[in-house]
Amino acid sequence: MDYGAILGKGAEADIYSFTAFGTEMVVKVRNPKAYRIAQIDNSIRRARTKKEARIMAHAAGIGVRVPRVFALGTFSIYMEMVKGKNANLLEEKELASRRVLGSAGEMLGMMHSSGIVHGDITPANIMVSGNGIYIIDFGLAEMSRSVEDMGVDLLLMERSVSKNGFGLFLEGYKGRNASSGNVLKRLEEIKRRGRYQNRSLD
């Protein structure tokens, strides 16, 4: 099927622009893996596509801004095209602000409070539009109450932004997640384990 112009290629999926009934959309298509048996590969891709759309709908239902899902194919998700700028392209002054990282922290706090772990929460998966920020790419997201998984989400963001930016992110996060103290404790444990492992490899 011709999905239109390609916007990006990833390890798991490709992203295309698509227009239907006068509406601009983004189509995320999960690619087959040649190393897997076709029947197994189809089953995995079908399940992951459904799960991603389901988690996006759950996030939207609790007030997190995510691209609206218009339709679901066997291996594809047709969703709203968010007009704006990827946060990964912003200058530090604009990125490290309450409007961007502060709001992103609030949204992740809401997600964690509702049992959603993003799995790849970095500025590259934040879109900044005229009416606020959007969290995108739920391809690695899980429904999980694991404090470890939530701590890893925070670690990913901490490693991706400045100290000041992460501080603003945490302000927003703590304001929306009543269990943030437990997650922050686990974050410190994860970091200590990482330092120990690094020393062991030296």
Residue ranges: model-predicted function:
Residues 21, 72-74, 129-130:
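Structural motif
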Residues 28, 52, 120, 137, ...:
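Acidic active-site catalytic centers that drive phospho-/nucleotidyl reactions
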Residues 31, 45-49, 53, 60, ...:
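Conserved structural core of kinase catalytic domains
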